């Protein structure tokens, strides 16, 4: 089984995953899958292009194949999914950084994964907290809202999505129910 968190930046995904590790020691956890496969330089917002996103897409594909194999043995929890990557790609397309062709291709890839139920449960984390400046992620609230809107659009017809809200303890309680 694959459980995944999804949400724009600064919604508490990594913090929540850290707490889940304590509660579910027999699960496999995949932290920051996009961060594992790229350098800080590749994730800089001023370097976004079809090329950079395509490199990230290829790396994510490889990581997904690994996780699909692991999930056959151990329940797996991810702190981000292909939905997140696609939402950012669509947002960057709206900002003119990514071509329409590449954005459409990634939207197709995302919809294919959702249709095939690659994720057993998707936990959506809406914007509830201030953006934390970690020197990498954007502090642009408009981008945060745009990505959140794209995520909601991608998940619109997904019946396996659960929205989590509140502080960390409230979110943990919602997951365990």
Question: Residue locations for each model-derived region?
Answer:
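The conserved Walker
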Residues: 9
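Hydrophobic anchor at the beta1->P-loop junction of P-loop NTPases
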Residues: 5
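Conserved substrate/cofactor phosphate-moiety recognition/catalytic segment
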Residues: 21-63
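Pre-Walker A (Motif I) flank of P-loop NTPase domains
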Residues: 1-2
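Conserved lysine of the Walker
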Residues: 13
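Hydrophobic positions on the alpha1 helix immediately C-terminal to the Walker A/P-loop
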Residues: 16, 20
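A basic- and aromatic-enriched beta-loop-alpha substructure that forms the phosphate/nucleotide-
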Residues: 59-100
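A glycine- and Lys/Arg-enriched "phosphate-lid" helix/loop adjacent to the NTP-binding pocket
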Residues: 88, 92-167
């Amino acid at each position: 089984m694959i459980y995944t968190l999804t949400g724009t930046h600064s919604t508490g995904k990594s913090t929540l995953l850290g707490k889940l590790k304590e509660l579910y020691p027999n699960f496999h956890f995949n932290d920051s899958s996009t961060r594992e496969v790229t350098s800080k330089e590749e994730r800089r917002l001023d370097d976004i292009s079809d090329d950079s996103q395509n490199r990230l897409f290829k790396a994510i594909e490889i990581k997904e194949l690994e996780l699909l194999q692991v999930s056959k043995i151990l329940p797996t929890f991810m702190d981000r999914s292909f939905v997140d990557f696609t939402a950012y790609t669509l947002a960057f397309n709206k900002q003119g950084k990514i071509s329409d062709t590449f954005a459409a291709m990634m939207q197709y890839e995302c919809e294919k994964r959702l249709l095939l139920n690659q994720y057993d449960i998707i936990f959506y984390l809406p914007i509830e907290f201030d953006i934390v400046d970690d020197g990498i992620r954007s502090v642009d609230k408009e981008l945060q809202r745009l990505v959140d809107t794209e995520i909601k659009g991608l998940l619109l017809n997904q019946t396996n999505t659960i929205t989590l809200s509140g502080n960390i303890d409230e979110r943990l309680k919602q997951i365990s129910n």
